[in-house]
Amino acid sequence: MSIKAEEISALIKQQLENYQAELNVEETGTVTYVGDGIARAHGLNNALSGELLEFSNGVFGMVQNLESNDVGIVIMGNYDGIHEGDVVKRTGRIMEVPVGDALIGRVVNPLGEPLDGKGAIQTTKTRPVENKAPGVMQRKSVEQPLQTGIKAIDALVPIGRGQRELIIGDRKTGKTTIAIDTILNQKDQDMICIYVAIGQKESTVRTQVETLRRYGAMDYTIVVSAGPSEPAPMLYLAPYAGAAMGEEFMYNGKHVLIVYDDLSKQADAYRELSLILRRPPGREAYPGDIFYTHSRLLERAAKLSDDLGGGSMTALPFVETKAGDVSAYIPTNVISITDGQVFLDGDYFNSGTRPAIDAGTSVSRVGGDAQIKAMKKVAGTLRLDLASYRELESFAQFGSDLDKATQAKLARGRRTVEVLKQPLHQPLSVENQVMILYALTHGFLDNVPVDDIQRFQDELFDYIASNNKELTDEIRETKQLPDTDKMDAAIKSFAEHFQPTKEAK
């Protein structure tokens, strides 16, 4: 077989014509320091703030400090495999997390990686962790109620869809319980819930996930967990990752409830990062931009205008206080950013008033706009009555000679406190809340012993469901209070048959 020279030259020419030179330019730097979740690198002169960088072992980091000689990088993951002298390269991308329906029912870390052992998350959608909050014209005023199922909140400090309501109190006063009960109450409410656990013990998060699963709430919930053993950057990033996951649903016209449990630990993680990055410390050693850290997060919660689909994201940030001191730096910051706060009192909690909500210092700046008309009517004077009872109660301790009007107020106040108590993980429907609050404010409980109030309430609900179901149906469907004569007749009929316990006071 003879090889022709012309064929060879033609083949070479063809190969040369088809050859495409690919020049792949990567800007790289050298790690000069690593430790405590932070790295410094020299040589990345064109790196951008917030840009994602890749280390030689595949771990990613985010540019946080831009200095004259080097860049400060927060490491997103385990930094044990990163050493001085390692190569780090720019990616040209910003920090993103996976989003979409595939995350619902899953437990993930702030990078969107699964923690529940159920395999990879099947989604190709991602969103930037940092995103600009909706502007004034992109928003709509909060008008739809978000029912928490907790009487004391829905009646006294109502929350609306798109609101930011701070839950504040000392440790072990029931903050997380309020969040879990609120999530449980969103069943069949067309709401997607995101629970962001920041610095919570992994055993605690496991317990919360099991509770949500037991009550069927994981069918519409995403859990984002950054445990206390994680590096500080993961704790700092967790709420932003949760917000990005929520925005995907909000901008698609859906309604989202996001719980940040809690922002005190995120602030501590950010303080740690900033001090290691040698940023100048301010009050309580927090960096100067700690207010902006929280404001840019919480401003992402909104009720969107109809032009943008009318979706909403409601935020319930938690802040832990020390000995009830709400004048500390982080509590005052977050109070000024949010649309109200629910203050939990340790003394109330220890005395058995649970949820331990202090009606005097709790407020919702959205107010009655976030209540159905029926609830607005029955709960109108409740807050004032409770505040005057607390005041009278403290004075009544010093003297026994009280006139009948004062004694009646104290008796009604004790029954009000008892009605607002609620067992763990038993959120109430809004129609049942309206029924019991109507009975309270119209004097039907005045002759019921305080110890029997909870039994009276439970039996009243059963009685109404069996004999006067049309009343609760009307409240649920029309959001209005039914005819008061019918309400009075139904409750009076039940009260006449109710048998108090002999030992009850």
Swiss-Prot record:
The record marks 362 as: Required for activity. It is found in: Cell membrane. Keywords: ATP synthesis, ATP-binding, Cell membrane, CF(1), Hydrogen ion transport, Ion transport, Membrane, Nucleotide-binding, Translocase, Transport. GO terms for molecular function: ADP binding; ATP binding; proton-transporting ATP synthase activity, rotational mechanism. Disulfide bonds: none annotated. It is an enzyme of class 7 (translocase). The keyword Methyltransferase does not apply. The keyword Methyltransferase does not apply. ATP binds at residues 169-176. It catalyses: ATP + H2O + 4 H(+)(in) = ADP + phosphate + 5 H(+)(out). It is a peripheral membrane protein. Its EC number is 7.1.2.2. It holds the Pfam family ATP-synt_ab_N. Signal peptide: none annotated. One of its GO terms (cellular component) is plasma membrane. Belongs to the ATPase alpha/beta chains family. Produces ATP from ADP in the presence of a proton gradient across the membrane. The alpha chain is a regulatory subunit. HAMAP family: ATP_synth_alpha_bact (MF_01346). F-type ATPases have 2 components, CF(1) - the catalytic core - and CF(0) - the membrane proton channel. CF(1) has five subunits: alpha(3), beta(3), gamma(1), delta(1), epsilon(1). CF(0) has three main subunits: a(1), b(2) and c(9-12). The alpha and beta chains form an alternating ring which encloses part of the gamma chain. CF(1) is attached to CF(0) by a central stalk formed by the gamma and epsilon chains, while a peripheral stalk is formed by the delta and b chains. This is ATP synthase subunit alpha. The gene is atpA.
